[in-house]
Every structure is written in structure tokens, then in C-alpha cells.
């Protein structure tokens, strides 16, 4: 816990102490102290509505209660400069900001660990995200899901959760048969032979590339093989090619996975039959009209769902239930799925299945990733100018750069539609948020280099009484808010909270830089203290950028 968090806790305790001293309530009656940061600086550093919360207990008007709390409050212990009462009884606290300088050495000593909290207390969470069919390139929705999912995992880990990142490989469905048939067509074409493309075949450039590679490596060997043997080989070859490409693309996008889980393994290991039997034993499965049904309405779904069709084939739902049962059998406390907007209607039946298996409500959470629209020169862009086809993740990275893609996708709430401005993403101006943040980091590194050239190294054991300007205190307050931003992002599953924080920190840094002189040759002690403040800012900004997968350049 850093000094800013400690002082906030002290302030809460002193508010309780003032309530007791004023005789407004017994200790057991005092509600949790809520502290908010006012939007306007003129309203103080913190504000509480404790007076309104106590009105019924104390049987007094909130404003009178607020006056009694203020009169009984010990300002010294909580480093309070002054207090005032606003509106019906809000109490505003103005801090004596000198305590903030204690934050500098604590950040310097914590280094890459600064921002870590333990709100997760080691809870085991599995996050499954991307999970695109291995039949083509990753599109914009996949890219946004990858960026959001990875940032969420990083934030959860920083907040003390035990996180596992998983990619579910859809390698057992009809789409893989179609992949094999499509590869076969392109293989024959590469040999100058004709074969009709299936109506629902895959026509991407990658399939053409697979066909050409097969022709180069094996010649016409497969033309003369039995179709079943040829299909089996093309299925395996095509799947491996596409998976290798997916892994490579995601690795280049700075999105690692701990587990790549094959759907086929559910069939091979008997997991599907086990899941069906588990539901049957609990009385949630019945037979009707020749089909096997899951009684999902018991758990809030709008209708019961078919698990096995009349022809004996499984619906998508049964293997998915088996997969989620397997996740929980592996010992995870909570599951988070990051799904595309087209899966919205699928959520109630999956949550029903988890409950039907005997797990508590809320064990499965689903984060929905909404659609992305690209804009260039103010116009909506549907196709890539280079390929004439839908824009892929690779295309977007080539167009604006990896950092811009990661930052922009982590910048908005995932469940809102996103307009991605390509011109803004490549502009070198303060209007471009990723440039603004990275330039702040590079600017700090430049100042630290200048200090080193003059023999001025930042350290944790300096005299920080030189830090006393309003801009310095604003910067320190923002630095002190990083652990809280991480905690909120983790608890609410909103990684964009960190991106918002990055912008606030960059703004505070630029504002300080434009108002103050960091290195003063006439005052080396003050210069070293300010360079230490710069180092603390650099550590915080770097740690925050890492959480969303964006680099922190030392030069720009």
C-alpha cells in the first residue's frame, strides 16, 4: 500500500473517530466511509457524504451532522489543511500536500511492482478470449477482443488474481471439413486442374497459399490418393498451417496464451458424454420428439435447448457445456469469456448450464466485444485498399502501427461500438492519445538523460522538501492514484480504466513540464528531487502502458 492509499485509510479512520467523538452514532452503527475525488479542484481533494448516511441514525439534519463532524475532526493526523461543507452536507477535505512527497521513494523502490494490489487474493480466474475459428485471418473484432482480453488479464494479474489465458481451438466442427475441401480446390488449381469450390468454402488468400505450398512440396501425389485419405491429410495440414499463423499473429500482437485447448480433445477424452451424464444425474436433461433437451428454463433461459438432435448429432451447446465443465474441473474459481457481439444471445444458456452443473451463479462472466468501424479521411472504410477485401488485424497494424492498435482498442469500453480513426492513430499531435502518452514517457527519459550528463541522479533518499509547487503535487496525486485505477479496472473488468489513467498521467506530466524547470544548475538538490519525481512518473507510466500492451519509447 503506497502513501496515498495509506493517507486515504487514515482519513477514513479519522472521519469515524470524529463521528464517535461527536456522539452521532455507536461504532457498530457507522456505515462504510465513502470518499470520492471531486471533479473540480476547488472542491478539495476528497469528499464524503457521511453526514447524509448518518441522518436517520443521528436524527439530525445532514448539514448539522456535517458541522459536528468538522468540529470534532483531528486535522493533524490525516494531514488535512482545511475542511468545508457543501450543499446539503457534503464534507470536502483539502490535504496538506507535503505528505505526497513520501510517495516518490516508495515508487522508486517498488519499480516494476508499483501499482500491484492484492484485491484478488490469489483467486484463480481463467480468461478465454479470441478463440477464432482456425480457417482464416484474424479480423478487426478478433483484434479488439485480443487487445481487451490481454489487457484484462494483465490488470487482473496486477491486482493479485491468479490468471490463466486460454484459446479454445474450434477444430471439431464442420468448418474444418470445409477448410480441407477448400484447400483441396486450391491444391488442384495450383496443379492446373479444376475442382468446384464448395458453396460455404473459404476463399481467402491464405487458402490459396496453402494449396500452392502443397503443390510445390508434394507435386500431384494427392491427386491419385483416395479422397478420404486426401481429405484427412488436407484437414490436418490446413489446420496446422492456420493455427501456426494464428499463433504467430497473436504473438506479434503481444498477446500470449498459457493454454491452447482443442475442441477435438473433448471427444477423444469422453468429456462430452461425462458432461451429458452430469446434467442427466441432476435431473436437467429430458427426451422429447426424438431429441435430447437441456431444461435451461429452470435457470432463467427463455426456452429449453436441444443438446442432441434427432439424427444423433450434437448441437454446438453440448460440447461447449463439456468445455466449461472441464474448465471448472481444472480448479478455476471463476471463468471469464470474452466473446463477440454475435454471441450475446448465447450467454443465458451457458450461464444456465454452469448453474445446472452445481456451480454458483456468477461463476461465469461474459464480456462482449462490440463492432469496430474504420474511418479514413472522414469516410467509413469497409475494404482494404491493398487487398480489396475485408481489413484484417495484420492490415490494420501495417496501416497505423502495433502500439496505436493496442492503445485504441483498449481505450473504450468493450461493449460499445468503436469508430477507429486511422488518420488520428498515425498523427504526431497531442490529439492522438497514444502519441501523447508515449511522448510523455520519451520526454521524461530525455530529462533523466540530461540529469545524468550533469551528474544528477535521482534517488530515494533525497530531501524532497524542495517539491512544493501545485503542478508537482498534482503529478504526485495522479501517480498515487495508479493502484486504485488498477484495482477498479480489475474489480469492474474494465481495462479501459487504465487507458484513461494513462491519459491523465501524461496530461499531469506535460502540464508540469510546461510550468516548471526540472534541472536548475543553480540548485542541484532541487534538481535531483525533481528528477526523482520524473523517475517515479516514468516508472508509473511504463507500468501502466505495459498493462495494455503498449511500448514505452525512450526516444521519439
UniProtKB/Swiss-Prot annotation:
The keyword Nucleotide-binding applies. PROSITE patterns: AA_TRNA_LIGASE_I (PS00178). One of its GO terms (cellular component) is cytoplasm. This is Arginine--tRNA ligase. Pfam families: Arg_tRNA_synt_N, DALR_1, tRNA-synt_1d. One of its GO terms (biological process) is arginyl-tRNA aminoacylation. It comes from Bacillus velezensis (strain DSM 23117 / BGSC 10A6 / LMG 26770 / FZB42). Keywords: Aminoacyl-tRNA synthetase, ATP-binding, Cytoplasm, Ligase, Nucleotide-binding, Protein biosynthesis. A motif ('HIGH' region) lies at residues 132-142. It catalyses: tRNA(Arg) + L-arginine + ATP = L-arginyl-tRNA(Arg) + AMP + diphosphate. Monomer. InterPro entries: aa-tRNA-synth_I_CS, Arg-tRNA-ligase, Arg-tRNA-synth_N, Arg-tRNA-synth_N_sf, ArgRS_core, DALR_anticod-bd, Rossmann-like_a/b/a_fold, tRNAsynth_Ia_anticodon-bd. Its EC number is 6.1.1.19. It is an enzyme of class 6 (ligase). Belongs to the class-I aminoacyl-tRNA synthetase family. It is found in: Cytoplasm. GO terms for molecular function: arginine-tRNA ligase activity; ATP binding. The gene is argS.
Amino acid at each position: 500500500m503506497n502513501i496515498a492509499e495509506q493517507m486515504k485509510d487514515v482519513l477514513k479512520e479519522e472521519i469515524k473517530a470524529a463521528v464517535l467523538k461527536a456522539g452521532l452514532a455507536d461504532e457498530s452503527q457507522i456505515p462504510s466511509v465513502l470518499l470520492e475525488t471531486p471533479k473540480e479542484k476547488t472542491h478539495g481533494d476528497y469528499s464524503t457524504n457521511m453526514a447524509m448516511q448518518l441522518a436517520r441514525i443521528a436524527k439530525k439534519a445532514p448539514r448539522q451532522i456535517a458541522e459536528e463532524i468538522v468540529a470534532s475532526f483531528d486535522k493533524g493526523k490525516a494531514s488535512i489543511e482545511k475542511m468545508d461543507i457543501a450543499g446539503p452536507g457534503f464534507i470536502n477535505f483539502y490535504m496538506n500536500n507535503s505528505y505526497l512527497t513520501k510517495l516518490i521513494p516508495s515508487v522508486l523502490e517498488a519499480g516494476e511492482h508499483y501499482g500491484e494490489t492484492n484485491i484478488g487474493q490469489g483467486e484463480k480466474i481463467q480468461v478465454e478470449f479470441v478463440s477464432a475459428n482456425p480457417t482464416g485471418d484474424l479480423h478487426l473484432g478478433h483484434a479488439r477482443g485480443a487487445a481487451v482480453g490481454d489487457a484484462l488479464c494483465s490488470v487482473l494479474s496486477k491486482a493479485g488474481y491468479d490468471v490463466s489465458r486460454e484459446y479454445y481451438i474450434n477444430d471439431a466442427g464442420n468448418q474444418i471439413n470445409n477448410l480441407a475441401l477448400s484447400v483441396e480446390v486450391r491444391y488442384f488449381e495450383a496443379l492446373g486442374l479444376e475442382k468446384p469450390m464448395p458453396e460455404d468454402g473459404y476463399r481467402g488468400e491464405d487458402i490459396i497459399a496453402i494449396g500452392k505450398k502443397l503443390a510445390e512440396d508434394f507435386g500431384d501425389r494427392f491427386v491419385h490418393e483416395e479422397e478420404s485419405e486426401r481429405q484427412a491429410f488436407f484437414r490436418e495440414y490446413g489446420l496446422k498451417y492456420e493455427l501456426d499463423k494464428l499463433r504467430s499473429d497473436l504473438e506479434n500482437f503481444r498477446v500470449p496464451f498459457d493454454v491452447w485447448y482443442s475442441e477435438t480433445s473433448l471427444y477423444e477424452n469422453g468429456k462430452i458424454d461425462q458432461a451429458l451424464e452430469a446434467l442427466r444425474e441432476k435431473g436437467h436433461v429430458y427426451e422429447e420428439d426424438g431429441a435430447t433437451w437441456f431444461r435451461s428454463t429452470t435457470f432463467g433461459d427463455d426456452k429449453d435447448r436441444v443438446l442432441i438432435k434427432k439424427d444423433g448429432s450434437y448441437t454446438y451447446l453440448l460440447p461447449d457445456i463439456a468445455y466449461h465443465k472441464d474448465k471448472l474441473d481444472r480448479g478455476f474459481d471463476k471463468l471469464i469469456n470474452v466473446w463477440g457481439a454475435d454471441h450475446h444471445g448465447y450467454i443465458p444458456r451457458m450461464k444456465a448450464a454452469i448453474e445446472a452443473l452445481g456451480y454458483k451463479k456468477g461463476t461465469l462472466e461474459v464480456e462482449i466485444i462490440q463492432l469496430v468501424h474504420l474511418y479514413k479521411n472522414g469516410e467509413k472504410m469497409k475494404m482494404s485498399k491493398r487487398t480489396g477485401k475485408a481489413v484484417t488485424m495484420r492490415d490494420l497494424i501495417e496501416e497505423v502501427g502495433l502500439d496505436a492498435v493496442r492503445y485504441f482498442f483498449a481505450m473504450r469500453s468493450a461493449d460499445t461500438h468503436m469508430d477507429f480513426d486511422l488518420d488520428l492513430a498515425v498523427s504526431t499531435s497531442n490529439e492522438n492519445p497514444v502519441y501523447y502518452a508515449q511522448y510523455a514517457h520519451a520526454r521524461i527519459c530525455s530529462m533523466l538523460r540530461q540529469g545524468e550528463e550533469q551528474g544528477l541522479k535521482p534517488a530515494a533518499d533525497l530531501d524532497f522538501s524542495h517539491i512544493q509547487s501545485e503542478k508537482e503535487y498534482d503529478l504526485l496525486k495522479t501517480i498515487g492514484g495508479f493502484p486504485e485505477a488498477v484495482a477498479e479496472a480489475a474489480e469492474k473488468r474494465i481495462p479501459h480504466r487504465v487507458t484513461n489513467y494513462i491519459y491523465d498521467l501524461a496530461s499531469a506530466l506535460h502540464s508540469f513540464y510546461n510550468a516548471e524547470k526540472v534541472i536548475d544548475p543553480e540548485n542541484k538538490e532541487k534538481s535531483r528531487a525533481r528528477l526523482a519525481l520524473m523517475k517515479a512518473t516514468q516508472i508509473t507510466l511504463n507500468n501502466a502502458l505495459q498493462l495494455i500492451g503498449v511500448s514505452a519509447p525512450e526516444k521519439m
